[in-house]
């Protein structure tokens, strides 16, 4: 049996508890609906994360192969010089957006992909293979930024799902059962008190009749 609440067994408390149970059940339904919606959203984004991870893995493999070919073409020393001469890319701006009531990151950044002239190294000291390697790594950066946003969103959704689940379970298995058990107890106690009053009045009536 669920633990009873520490309240007086009165009709006022009975009415109050019935109202609280009604509100608790309404809150439980809303939280359960929220939990279900969060889980659906989580798995939708999870599928996107899996796809991005697979694509990122492929792109990184392509990028490192292209880098090896560029190194063969111009040599490691020259490749390092070229990398140091590259102009810094655009800044990444991290904002927030709302997903099912959860604040998640929104990474705003223009594509990292640039033309050869925008990268800042000299044409004469480079080669098509260096350009290809740079292009491949720029593709990797684009995917990595998107994946970072998606994975952080997943983490925050997972935390919110866990918090919501605890609230749902608390209402379902502790709070509502305690209130319902207390309502049952108060009803029984009021019935007992009513019977006691009835028999008390009956005895009083019998005594009065016996004296008259």
From Swiss-Prot:
UniProt-listed HAMAP family: ATP_synth_D_arch (MF_00271)
GO cellular component terms, A-Z: plasma membrane
Highest taxon above the source species: Archaea
Record carries keyword Repressor: no
Name recorded for this polypeptide: A-type ATP synthase subunit D
Organism in which the protein naturally occurs: Thermococcus onnurineus (strain NA1)
Membrane topology designation: Peripheral membrane protein
InterPro entries: V_ATPase_D (IPR002699)
Entry similarity comment: Belongs to the V-ATPase D subunit family.
